[in-house]
Amino acid sequence: MQLNSSMSAVITGGASGLGAATARLLASKGVKVALFDLNVEQGEALAQELKGVFCKVDVTSQEDCESGFAKARETIGQERILVNCAGTGNAVKTAGRDKQTGAIKTFPMDKFELIVQINLLGTFRCIALSAAGMMTLDPCDEFGERGVIVNTASVAAQDGQMGQASYSAPKAGV
């Protein structure tokens, strides 16, 4: 796909890290960008810098995702590009001993479930909503392409380390 100024992109986790770098790269090619993130201060500042739009989106919320895509499309048009960078991790052993009592304790399932909600299910939520929107577009090339979706996984999905099971599992799913 040739990037140009007629295209729009949504970047989840777009306020910092890989998401911000991706947004900067796309904007440098003329692509209009919408940044989805929870960090309002950084997101709004970067959106202003890139002449894009910031949408406060919690990817664990279907309602937030739907509202974010609606706002982005209203402001910069239907995206042809989705880059899923939203993610989090928690470097904690799955099981260990309490240093004071010696009792065995396990990683809290609610923390694991939140990481899965963000890293795996949040990615899928945005894929589904973006793909549905892209289906409304005319093809942009002779091959019938309507858009592109890029999902960021991690080498940890294949080569995890101690304390990364809660991060590695959903990244393997991506």
Sequence positions of predicted segments:
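Substrate-binding pocket helix/loop in short-chain dehydrogenase/reductase
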Residues: 93-104, 108-113
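Conserved glycine-rich Rossmann-like NAD(P)H-binding loop of the short-chain dehydrogenase/reductase
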Residues: 29-45
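Rossmann-fold cofactor-recognition segment
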Residues: 49-63
